[in-house]
Each structure stands twice: as structure tokens, then as C-alpha cells.
């Protein structure tokens, strides 16, 4: 039941590639390679040697951690409650873990090295999209605060740009689409923050490594007549390809106070 609540509450997981390969295996640290591009091919004349480039690699590591939350309910609370405290505890435990996983995914994205300052306008969205240094196709999700989402949408309507009809939205509750970027409102970001993430199955922006699925345990303190319930999950979220991320600082539009 808690795992069901967790999956329903998770919102930003689609921005990450979920990897369950560590489940049931020893170790709490994952080391992964990061390859650098060898460059475009060049014209080679007849009889000339093909230039050989070395594939550049560097490694990074991420450590598995545990997110946990617990509740306790007295027998008096169970007997006198109008609702269903145990069911509500289950729901809230799933929500608590989901919020922590979402927070960690966003924190990983914030480590991106491609940075830009923009205004909350259609032009600002274009400026951020121009930072992506590749020409590969992929859905771009722009995560902004509710206030900035409203400003961008108003500017889009004024300039006859954008659409409220979104096909194949990556994130539940996507607000609207402008210049091909799916704008998502989130109170997890401040009014000076915006995150742009390009989807790529081959080289995702973020990876979410799950060591163990959510585990729920209950116990009784018979001396105090208390029911204890805990939930925890072992995982880590890390920035895998920062070329798929643009971290923007939002400033007020010219003329705004």
C-alpha cells in the first residue's frame, strides 16, 4: 500500500532514468564512466591515414543513501478517530518518501554546469533552449515556480505562442507548452530558479539508482499501547549528463517592479 502511494506521489521520476541493477547486490557506491566526444569526422584523401583520436573518459561516483520516515499512533487515537489513522499514515509515508526522492532528483539537476540568466518570458525560454549544445531531438521540460509559470504563459498568450494542449506530457500536471518546452509548475523551486532538462534515453540527464524498494515495517510498544510504522528506501539520484541540463536564474522582466 505504501509503495502504491509512493509511485502515485512521485512526480519528477520521468526526468531520470531508473536503474535497478544494484538490487540484491553488495556495495553502496556506484562508479560510472563519463565519456567525452571525439569530435566530428573529417575528410581523408586517398592513401592518407585516418586520424586516430583517443576516447576521453573520466569517472564519477555516487553513494546509495537511505530516506526514511515513521509515525506512531496511540490506541486512544485509533479508537476515537473519525477517519482511518492507519490508512492515512500509510498514505503520508508514501508521500513523504516520494517528496524526498523528487527533491533529490531536482538537487541533482541543479548541479548542472550550463547556466544562464533569463527573464520569465517566451524570449527567456528561447535563450535557455539555445544553451543546449547538441542538436539531438528530445523533449525539454522546464521546471519553474508557479509565479514564473504564470508570467511565461501570459507572455506566450500575448505573443500568440505556446499551447495548453500538450501531447505526450512527460510530467504529470504539465502547465503548457512553449517553443517545444513543456512548462511544469513546482513550489519546490524559488522565483529566481528554473531548470531545463532534455530527455535522452541513451544518455539521460539524471539517473535514479534504486538499491532496495520501499520497505514498510510495523511494530507495537505494548507498554505504551502505541502502533509504530516506518518506511524507508535505499537509492541515490545523480547528474549523469550535464549537457542535457540548463540551470537558469530568473530575473524580472524589463519594466517590472
Predicted features and spans:
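Generic "edge-of-domain/loop-turn" microfeature
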Residues: 37-39, 69, 78, 149, ...
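Extended, solvent-exposed, turn-rich assembly/linker loops in the middle of proteins
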Residues: 108-181
Amino acid at each position: 500500500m505504501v509503495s502504491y502511494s509512493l509511485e502515485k506521489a512521485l512526480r519528477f521520476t520521468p526526468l531520470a532514468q531508473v536503474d535497478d541493477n544494484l538490487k540484491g547486490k553488495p556495495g553502496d557506491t556506484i562508479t560510472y564512466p563519463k565519456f567525452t566526444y571525439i569530435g566530428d569526422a573529417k575528410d581523408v584523401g586517398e592513401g592518407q591515414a585516418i586520424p586516430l583520436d583517443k576516447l576521453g573518459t573520466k569517472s564519477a561516483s555516487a553513494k546509495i543513501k537511505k530516506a526514511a520516515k515513521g509515525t506512531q499512533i496511540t490506541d486512544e487515537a485509533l479508537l476515537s478517530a473519525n477517519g482511518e489513522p492507519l490508512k492515512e499514515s500509510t498514505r503520508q509515508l508514501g508521500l513523504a518518501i516520494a517528496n524526498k526522492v523528487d527533491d533529490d532528483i531536482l538537487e541533482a539537476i541543479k548541479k548542472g554546469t550550463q547556466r544562464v540568466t533569463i527573464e520569465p518570458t517566451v524570449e527567456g525560454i528561447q535563450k535557455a533552449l539555445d544553451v543546449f549544445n547538441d542538436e539531438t531531438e528530445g523533449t525539454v521540460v522546464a521546471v519553474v515556480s508557479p509565479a514564473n509559470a504564470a508570467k511565461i504563459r501570459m507572455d506566450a498568450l500575448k505573443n500568440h505562442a505556446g499551447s495548453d494542449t500538450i501531447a505526450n506530457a512527460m510530467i504529470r500536471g504539465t502547465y503548457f507548452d512553449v517553443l517545444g518546452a513543456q512548462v511544469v509548475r513546482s513550489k519546490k523551486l524559488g522565483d529566481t530558479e528554473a531548470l531545463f532538462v532534455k530527455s535522452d534515453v541513451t544518455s539521460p540527464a539524471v539517473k535514479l539508482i534504486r538499491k532496495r524498494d520501499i520497505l514498510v515495517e510495523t511494530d507495537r510498544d505494548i507498554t505504551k499501547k502505541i502502533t509504530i510504522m516506518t518506511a524507508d528506501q535505499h537509492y541515490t539520484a545523480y547528474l549523469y549528463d550535464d549537457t542535457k541540463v540548463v540551470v537558469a536564474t530568473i530575473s524580472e522582466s524589463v519594466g517590472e517592479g
